[in-house]
Amino acid sequence: MLGIIKTEFLKLKRFHVLLIGLIGMTLPAILSVFTQAVATPEVTTQNFDFFALFNSTIWNSATIFMPVIFTLIGGYLISREYTDNTLKNILTVPVSFQRLLFGKLLAMGILSVLFGFYSYTITLIVGVLSGISGLSAVVLCTGLLQMLGISAFTYIAVLPIIAFTIRKPGIFMGGVIVSFLFGYSAMFIKDVTMRSLYPILSGLTVMRFDTGTFMNTSEHGNLTLSMLSITVMLLLTITIVRLTNPPQAVFKRKKHKKTDILIRKRPKGR
């Protein structure tokens, strides 16, 4: 498994999709500052300090950018094996197709946390350059823990979408659209029970993120329900991957290749 993860990170160096992810994870902090600057006085945050900047960045990331970016890169990692016609070569190694998928998904999980740290760093830089006040050790630690934790939980929330859309070649972009709608819809869920169960928002509840500023509600989500929701997402992903088989086209190509070899080796009759 470690070998698969290491290989995936080596492959990522050659993929332009990683650059798309870095650009995408730069935008939440910039969007937070820009929104605060152009908004009317009635809707602006009165004391927009570093604490508010981190909260706004995390909210924008979890509901808009992370679901799309994680699904895009996660699906791309596996889709490339189909489009580059390399899957048939990989499957000759004594590694099952399901184990290969688990390795790729785990590599993307690690990458999602790294993206969270990258977004945290960008938020600090944007805040300092914008002259925002209120930077302290408590704010730094809280922002880091929440950013990393919510990155991981947001990835878990979209894992079933990734796992389902990689079952067949060429449909992972449909998963990107579904993930966007999945994250964007979270903004309109007000009921505390639904917020606790909705996978995108479950991670916010577990990390004790205050959604009051963004959802106009002071009620905290139910931690037990949120943990249950996250567990269901993991179990659902495991089930989908275990039920996923290699595309039949791979076996057909391998079979045809063996047949061609036998034909070429067959001696000519007199």
Located regions from the model:
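Pore- or pathway-lining transmembrane helices of multi-pass membrane proteins that form conduits
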Residues: 20-26, 169-187
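Secretory targeting signals
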Residues: 26-69, 102-167
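Terminal transmembrane helical anchor/hairpin motif
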Residues: 34-53, 176-257
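Transmembrane alpha-helical segments in integral membrane proteins
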Residues: 68-82, 87, 158-173, 231-246
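Membrane-helix interface segments
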Residues: 16-18, 96-98, 102, 139, ...
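Aromatic- and glycine-rich beta-strand/loop motifs that create alpha-glucan
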Residues: 1-25, 170, 253-256, 270
